[in-house]
Amino acid sequence: TNKKLGGKVQCICVAYEGMERFFPADKIVMTGNPIRSVFVPCTQEMKEEGVKDYGLDPAKKHIFVVGGSLVSSKINQIMRKWISEGCPGSEGVDVLWQCGKYYKAGIDQFMAEETAKNPALKDTVRYSDFIGRMDLAYAAADVVISRSGASSVSELCAAHKAVVFIPSPNVAEDHQTHNAMALVRKDAAMIVKDADAMEKMMPTALELLRKPEKIASLEENAGKMALPDAARKIADEIYKLV
């Protein structure tokens, strides 16, 4: 649909470089994706608030696992496998996991069974079907694991977060991989292919967690790619046409 419309419209607002592959170059304007104003560079105050709100241990490092707006069953499967194996590599780490409303009942049962076998699990993994304050969850996290839909990528750049992207393969023209690679090429994110994620997702995030200089570099470079005024820029382009 986008390609068909691209030949008929006067202006095409995009969020990433390289869109000349899909649209006429003279129509492209780099605006970014509109996101809520709460997504700003994370501060220490925001981090402390997020850690408190989500019941995390302030003495630990934190990973936030989020599967996108519809929540990824694959990411949930990976989390269940990692937890059932005893959360390897999680010493000194808290994990906040958004599991999604659709999956919550099954995960409640799974977590009850796993906690009965390993009572320390409740001190390592916090999970919820829905995260109301994504800005604070991002702020609490030292590393985020996420799908790479357009809105998620824009939010994470605006928040200046270090992220391991797991692009969904179940999207048109593999656009989530293109979204993630736009950051990876600028050393602003890391990527694990969906096909490799079962074995590599958590080890990659946990390894990154032990590299504060790498995290700082990813955060800085992600921030450079943020386009926080996207809504205004798009509105300006619309006004030019009317």
Positions of the model-derived regions?
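Conserved acidic donor-binding segment of nucleotide-sugar-dependent glycosyltransferases
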Residues: M190-D196, L208-P212
